[in-house]
């Protein structure tokens, strides 16, 4: 893996919200040793029915162990950086809040029937939302993805599902349903992003907020980029996340040999 391209996706500096989120998740983890944050903010199926909104929106911030935190930080870094770069910093914050809320509601609804006592916490739901979102976008360009540069491939759209099952097998204590519903939200947003945009603040409101906070935005350290909404075109064509290799052709135009997929 090219670690430089992972740390600096697209060769661009780290995005402001993504960087701030990593720092904040680490701070929350450390504070959880002093305050009962895990007990207060972990999401339980009953949280929805008791209208515990703090749990419904903040459960991704809580991590139960250092490996839990590290894995999620590493997993979310590149896709969230790219999302922020193409959608704007404030919009990305709205995206994270709404996706956590939607996944949390689904988790609680099914959990009331199947796992009434099971708690869920951590940013892995966000990770799976981003994985599903980008796998859907990527599948429109590259329908199949090679497995570790072998001659074998799987449908790009289903790659997050493979990861979901693999994690459930390798780490039995992980929250399968929390990951699954994060995945569902990501697929839904990727499929109908125009619908999702209708429930987010209009661009002119975000721009107005940013102008009122311009003094604070200018305090962001050098080397970290804040993406202003007025500079973002969310209608531009999707750009591949990690790879720039040529997609496999879907048909034979009689100009050469069609590449096969295993």
UniProtKB/Swiss-Prot annotation:
Membrane topology label: Multi-pass membrane protein
According to the record, the residues making up region (Disordered) are 243-262
**Stored Pfam families:** Rhomboid (PF01694)
- Quickly give the catalysed reaction: Cleaves type-1 transmembrane domains using a catalytic dyad composed of serine and histidine that are contributed by different transmembrane domains
List the keywords (alphabetical). Answer: Golgi apparatus, Hydrolase, Membrane, Protease, Serine protease, Transmembrane, Transmembrane helix
In which compartments does the protein localize?
A: Golgi apparatus membrane; Golgi apparatus, cis-Golgi network membrane
Q: Which residues lie on this side of the membrane: Lumenal?
A: 38-57, 111-112, 169-174
Which residues span the membrane? Answer: 17-37, 58-78, 90-110, 113-133, 152-168, 175-191
GO molecular-function terms, A-Z: serine-type endopeptidase activity
What does the record list as coiled-coil region(s)? Answer: none
Database matches in InterPro entries: Peptidase_S54_rhomboid_dom (IPR022764), Rhomboid-like_sf (IPR035952)
Q: Which residues lie on this side of the membrane: Cytoplasmic?
A: 1-16, 79-89, 134-151, 192-262
Cellular component per GO?
Answer: Golgi apparatus; Golgi membrane; nuclear periphery
Miscellaneous information on this protein? Present with 7850 molecules/cell in log phase SD medium.
The role this protein plays is: Probable rhomboid-type serine protease that catalyzes intramembrane proteolysis.
The family assignment reads:
Belongs to the peptidase S54 family.
Subunit and interaction comment: Interacts with SNX3.
Q: What is the protein named?
A: Rhomboid-type serine protease 2
């Amino acid at each position: 893996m090219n670690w430089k391209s992972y740390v600096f996706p697209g060769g661009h500096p780290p995005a402001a919200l993504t960087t701030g989120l990593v720092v904040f998740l680490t701070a929350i983890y450390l504070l959880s040793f002093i305050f009962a944050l895990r007990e207060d903010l972990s999401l339980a199926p009953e949280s929805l029915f008791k209208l515990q909104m703090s749990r419904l929106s903040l459960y991704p911030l809580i991590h139960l162990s250092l490996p839990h935190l590290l894995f999620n930080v590493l997993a979310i870094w590149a896709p969230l950086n790219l999302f922020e770069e193409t959608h704007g910093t404030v919009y990305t914050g709205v995206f994270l809040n709404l996706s956590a809320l939607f996944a949390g509601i689904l988790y609680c609804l099914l959990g009331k029937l199947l796992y009434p006592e099971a708690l869920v916490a951590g940013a892995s739901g966000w990770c799976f939302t981003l994985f599903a979102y980008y796998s859907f976008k990527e599948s429109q360009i590259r329908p199949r993805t090679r497995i570790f540069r072998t001659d074998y491939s799987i449908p790009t759209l289903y790659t997050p599902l493979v990861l979901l099952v693999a994690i459930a097998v390798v780490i039995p204590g992980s929250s399968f349903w929390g990951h699954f519903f994060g995945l569902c939200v990501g697929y839904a947003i990727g499929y109908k992003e125009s619908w999702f945009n209708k429930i987010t603040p209009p661009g002119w409101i975000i721009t107005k907020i940013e102008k009122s906070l311009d003094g604070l935005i200018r305090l962001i350290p050098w080397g970290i980029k804040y993406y202003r909404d007025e500079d973002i075109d969310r209608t531009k064509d999707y750009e591949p996340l990690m790879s720039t290799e040529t997609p496999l052709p879907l048909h034979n135009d009689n100009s050469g040999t069609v590449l096969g997929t295993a």
